[in-house]
């Protein structure tokens, strides 16, 4: 049986992390669930431990730093990465992972934008930013990736162990896509459901400052890769 690891980068997700873990216990009971806690000031780590996750602290702030540690530390045949905010159903994430398990993709993408994202997401500037990033990446790389910034992906071991993580923050989503496009790695997408954050759960993404970093990252990576 192939080894599957569920990777959940977390920063202050006390309200939602239990739902995420239990959802995967139900739909993918054979998987190991790793919660990397990125200096949370709430009880994210405690709740994750209580629900059976493997909890690892990551002291360098930023999602990119968390992903770097995850990819370095964890050995598996297939890796599923989801945000800890309970916006991605585990049932759909398993379908994304199946594309990797079947050998159809090195990176599989859960495409929110072709599904419920624009009706569920209540942050209009996030919607605009997603469209802008998608258009720019596809123009530069002559590609047709539908959801560049999704927080639900699956990876092969080959992808994970060959990916040089350069970004420290949320730009990591863009970097993963650019890496796959530049190296001509097989990418597959499948539409998935997306649900908005529950009341009281706050997005850590700053639309303007993080959006600016993403744009800078796109041009930096284009220069370095090309």
Regions found by a protein language model. Name each.
Residues 37-45:
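A conserved acidic beta->alpha catalytic loop
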Residues 13-16, 40, 63:
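Donor nucleotide-sugar binding loop of glycosyltransferases
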Residues 12-26:
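Short, well-formed alpha-helical segments that are part of the catalytic scaffolds
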Residues 79:
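Short aromatic/hydrophobic "clamp" motif used to bind/position activated sugar donors
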Residues 3-5, 32, 175:
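Cell-envelope/extracellular polymer assembly enzymes that use nucleotide-activated donors
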Residues 38, 82-84:
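Active-site acidic Asp-centered loop
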Residues 59-73, 90-170, 196-212:
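Acceptor/aglycone-binding surface of glycosyltransferases and processive sugar-polymer synthases
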Residues 1, 140-143, 165-226:
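Hydrophobic helical membrane-anchoring modules
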């Amino acid at each position: 049986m192939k080894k599957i690891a569920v990777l959940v980068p977390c920063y202050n997700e006390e309200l939602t992390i239990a739902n995420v873990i239990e959802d995967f216990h139900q739909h993918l009971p054979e998987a190991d669930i790793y919660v990397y806690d990125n200096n949370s000031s709430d009880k994210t780590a405690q709740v994750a431990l209580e629900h059976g996750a493997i909890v690892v602290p990551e002291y360098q702030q930023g999602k990119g730093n968390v992903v770097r540690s995850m990819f370095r530390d964890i050995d598996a045949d297939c890796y599923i990465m989801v945000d800890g905010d309970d916006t991605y159903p585990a049932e759909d994430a398993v379908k994304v992972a199946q594309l990797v398990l079947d050998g159809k993709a090195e990176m599989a993408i859960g495409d929110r934008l072709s599904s419920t994202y624009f009706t569920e997401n209540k942050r209009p500037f996030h919607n605009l930013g997603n469209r802008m990033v998608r258009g720019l990446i596809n123009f530069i790389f002559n590609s047709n990736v539908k959801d560049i910034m999704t927080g639900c992906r699956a990876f092969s071991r080959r992808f994970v162990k060959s990916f040089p993580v350069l970004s420290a923050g949320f730009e990591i989503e863009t970097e993963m896509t650019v890496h796959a496009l530049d190296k001509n790695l097989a990418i597959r997408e499948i539409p998935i459901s997306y649900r908005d954050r529950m009341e009281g759960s706050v997005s850590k993404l700053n639309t303007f400052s993080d959006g600016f970093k993403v744009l800078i990252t796109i041009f930096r990576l284009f220069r370095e890769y090309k």
